[in-house]
A protein has these predicted regions:
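Extracytoplasmic/secreted cell-surface and envelope-processing proteins
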Residues: 21, 101-102
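A short, hydrophobic beta-strand/beta-hairpin element that forms part of a small beta-sheet core
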Residues: 89-100
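N-terminal secretory signal peptides
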Residues: 5-49, 53
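C-terminal partner/receptor-binding element of secreted or periplasmic proteins
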Residues: 102-121
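Acidic/histidine-rich, surface-exposed loop or edge segments in extracytoplasmic proteins
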Residues: 57-63
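Thioredoxin-like thiol-disulfide oxidoreductase module
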Residues: 63-86
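Bacterial N-terminal signal peptides
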Residues: 1-3
Length: 121
């Protein structure tokens, strides 16, 4: 990567069905992470609603602040991706302004974005 790309603010938006090769310093947002966390909390629950509620509440307590942060961050990340107008995954966003779609190799996507920026200042 060129120094500009390495120093750039890089956000990768994907999901578990579209794995990416991230680069150091890039933040990866998985759009299906909130659903996966909810599935973890709901795994193997009994049919009785009262028992299921008690078990989920226990799991939330046991997860503590770390689980709460994880859930909150997952939803914040999804909201950020929507706010950026991400239309499909994988997407690589540089400096919250330039977006490349469809490239799972983040370094290659950033290089393409940088090449575009050089030829279209």
């Amino acid at each position: 990567l060129c120094q500009a790309a390495a120093a750039a603010d890089v956000l990768v938006v994907t999901d578990s069905r579209h794995p990416v090769q991230a680069v150091a310093g890039a933040r990866v947002v998985e759009l299906d992470l909130p659903a996966r966390i909810e599935a973890e909390l709901a795994a193997n629950l009994p049919a009785d609603p009262a028992q299921a509620t008690a078990i989920v509440q226990q799991r939330l307590r046991e997860g503590g602040e770390e689980l709460q942060r994880r859930i909150g961050r997952a939803y914040q990340d999804v909201a950020e991706a929507w706010g950026l107008g991400i239309a499909k995954v994988p997407a690589v966003v540089v400096e919250r302004r330039y977006v490349g779609y469809g490239e799972a190799d983040v370094a290659r996507a950033v290089a393409r974005i940088e090449a575009h920026r050089r030829t279209n200042p």
